[in-house]
Amino acid sequence: MKVNANTMRKGHILEDGGKLYVITAANIVQPGKGGAFIQLEMKDVRTGTKTSMRFRTQETVERARLDEHEMSFLFAEGDQYTFMDKESFEQVTIPGDVIGDGKVFLQDGMEVVVQSFEGAPLSVELPQTVTLRIVEADPVVKGQTASSSYKPAVLENGVRVLVPPHVDAGTRIVVNVEDGTYLERAKD
């Protein structure tokens, strides 16, 4: 289906010249002179070769028609991740490189959308946010409040994030899955 180039995001699948590409990075650039454009870093689904393309923001591109299945994450074994289709209860094992950097945020029972083309899984769309517990947080250094100060903290999955000074170990926080940043304290 044809969509505006500026709606393309990381994880989307683009069809160009009969080839399928998964977008690994999308940056909108606004130069001082001329119109804005979007720079897409992509990986060929079949060969794995990386390429980049540039489109004007008002240009249309062909987004690949994919089969989407709602699945639940079951378990990980090495770099293989097993999901269960919520309709057919069929189990599917997906390699870690298909999931991408977000695999560290997978939790038991997490609901995801698996996109596949001709039966082969191409990408896994994780929820935008995930709630995790902080297991270790540095103490607050007094007197550094002239600017917004953040301190490093380690989450239960081993990921390091920067959190505000009032957040301590044991606190549950909401994290943005796409870039791994702190959003807010969990409301539970």
From Swiss-Prot:
Q: Kindly indicate whether the keyword Cytoplasm belongs to this entry.
A: yes
- What SUPFAM superfamilies does this protein map onto? Nucleic acid-binding proteins, Translation proteins SH3-like domain
Q: What GO CC terms are in its UniProt record?
A: cytoplasm
Where is the protein situated, by its record's location annotation?
Cytoplasm
This protein's pathway reads:
Protein biosynthesis; polypeptide chain elongation
What does the UniProt keyword field contain? Answer: Cytoplasm, Elongation factor, Protein biosynthesis
GO BP annotations listed:
peptide biosynthetic process
Name any one Pfam family assigned in the record.
Elong-fact-P_C
Could you name the domain of life of the organism this protein comes from? Bacteria
TM stretches of this protein: none
Instruction: Give the main localization category.
Output: cytoplasm
**GO-annotated molecular function:** translation elongation factor activity
Database matches in HAMAP family: EF_P
Q: What role does this protein play?
A: Involved in peptide bond synthesis. Stimulates efficient translation and peptide-bond synthesis on native or reconstituted 70S ribosomes in vitro. Probably functions indirectly by altering the affinity of the ribosome for aminoacyl-tRNA, thus increasing their reactivity as acceptors for peptidyl transferase.
Annotated family? Belongs to the elongation factor P family.
What's the protein here called? Elongation factor P
The species this protein was found in: Rhodospirillum centenum (strain ATCC 51521 / SW)
